[in-house]
């Protein structure tokens, strides 16, 4: 059964008239939207980075902050929306600037929990760059908590993963955290 057919079945199960004007193309649109929102499954880290790794003598912190992200909670398939802050300490190589955002998007465009998303991003940046440390903080609002359940409209989940010097060196961690404020 195709994704489109499954959306038709869901609408019918909800009691909707799937032949009414406003819903005629909804299953097709919903299937296309879901495929787009989950396109990270069709991407690999190698494809996303695409060789954009450059030699550099810089060993100071490199950070991209306020990277918008949109993902779907794996428990309810509802969106969570937020921003990621990603930093690393180069160890002879720097990553093309847009590639940090593309790594975030690749993992965010999968059914996820934010805790795992944060770790996947950190480990991918570490793997690709060979950095001596990586820090990732994600702040996001979860529709599964805002639209249903406890219905808390102003809640934000904050997660962090610190690897290498970001974990072992308090000054590095503090510098990173102060830069994202």
Curated annotation (Swiss-Prot):
It catalyses: GTP + H2O = 7,8-dihydroneopterin 3'-triphosphate + formate + H(+). Gene3D superfamilies: 1.10.286.10, 3.30.1130.10. GO terms for biological process: one-carbon metabolic process; tetrahydrobiopterin biosynthetic process; tetrahydrofolate biosynthetic process. One of its GO terms (molecular function) is zinc ion binding. Pathway: Cofactor biosynthesis; 7,8-dihydroneopterin triphosphate biosynthesis; 7,8-dihydroneopterin triphosphate from GTP: step 1/1. Its EC number is 3.5.4.16. It comes from the Bacteria. GO terms for cellular component: cytoplasm. Keywords: GTP-binding, Hydrolase, Metal-binding, Nucleotide-binding, One-carbon metabolism, Zinc. Zn(2+) binds at residues 73, 76, 144. Belongs to the GTP cyclohydrolase I family. Homomer. NCBIfam families: folE, PRK09347.1-2, PRK09347.1-3. This is GTP cyclohydrolase 1. It comes from Azotobacter vinelandii (strain DJ / ATCC BAA-1303). The gene is folE.
């Amino acid at each position: 059964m195709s994704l489109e057919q499954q959306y038709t079945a869901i609408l019918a199960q909800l009691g909707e008239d799937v032949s009414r004007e406003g819903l005629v193309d909804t299953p097709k649109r919903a299937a296309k939207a879901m495929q787009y929102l989950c396109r990270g499954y069709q991407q690999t880290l190698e494809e996303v980075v695409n060789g954009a790794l450059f030699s550099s003598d810089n060993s100071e912190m490199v950070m991209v902050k306020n990277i918008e992200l949109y993902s779907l909670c794996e428990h309810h398939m509802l969106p969570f929306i937020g921003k990621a802050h990603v930093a690393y300490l180069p160890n002879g190589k720097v990553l093309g600037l847009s590639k940090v955002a593309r790594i975030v998007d690749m993992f965010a465009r999968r059914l996820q929990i934010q805790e795992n998303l944060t770790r996947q991003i950190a480990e991918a940046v570490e793997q690709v760059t060979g950095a001596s440390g990586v820090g990732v903080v994600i702040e996001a609002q979860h529709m599964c908590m805002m639209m249903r359940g406890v219905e808390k409209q102003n809640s934000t989940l904050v997660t962090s993963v610190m690897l290498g010097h970001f974990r072992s060196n308090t000054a590095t961690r503090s510098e990173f955290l102060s830069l994202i404020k």
